[in-house]
């Protein structure tokens, strides 16, 4: 499952090893129930096992925040950060709040590049997977 390449071009440096200058932040809403994040942590851990530098960040309730995750990656020497929102659709959080947060990151960390992937539901492969999942659930 990947973002459409037309919107987020593949980055040959992501996962290139310890000398890579690129990292990923998986950005999710957050919840009061701590177990809520377990699937996200599993995705993060699987991506890390592939050699990517990946951090989780949350819009609210949970930590770290997007700013804290970005600050940590930049302190570790990463110059390109791709933010992958784990939201199914483009609502207020992705249309208004995330762009404002990314604008703030760009001002505070002018020497870094911040990219933003589209919502999960913008990817035809994600929609096909959801359709297949629903079909399995009703049979």
What are these regions (language model features)?
Residues 1-139:
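Active-site-proximal alpha-helix that buttresses catalytic centers in soluble enzyme cores
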């Amino acid at each position: 499952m990947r973002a459409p390449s037309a919107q987020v071009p593949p980055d040959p440096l992501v996962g290139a090893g310890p000398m890579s200058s690129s990292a990923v932040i998986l950005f999710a809403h957050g919840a009061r129930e701590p177990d809520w994040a377990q699937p996200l942590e599993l995705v993060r851990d699987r991506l890390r096992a592939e050699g990517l530098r990946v951090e989780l960040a949350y819009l609210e309730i949970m930590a770290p925040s997007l700013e804290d995750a970005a600050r940590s990656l930049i302190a570790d020497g990463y110059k390109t950060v791709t933010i992958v929102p784990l939201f199914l659709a483009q609502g207020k959080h992705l249309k208004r709040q995330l762009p404002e947060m990314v604008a703030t990151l760009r001002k505070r960390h002018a020497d870094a590049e911040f990219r933003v992937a589209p919502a999960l539901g913008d990817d035809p492969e994600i929609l096909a997977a959801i359709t297949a999942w629903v079909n399995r659930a009703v049979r």
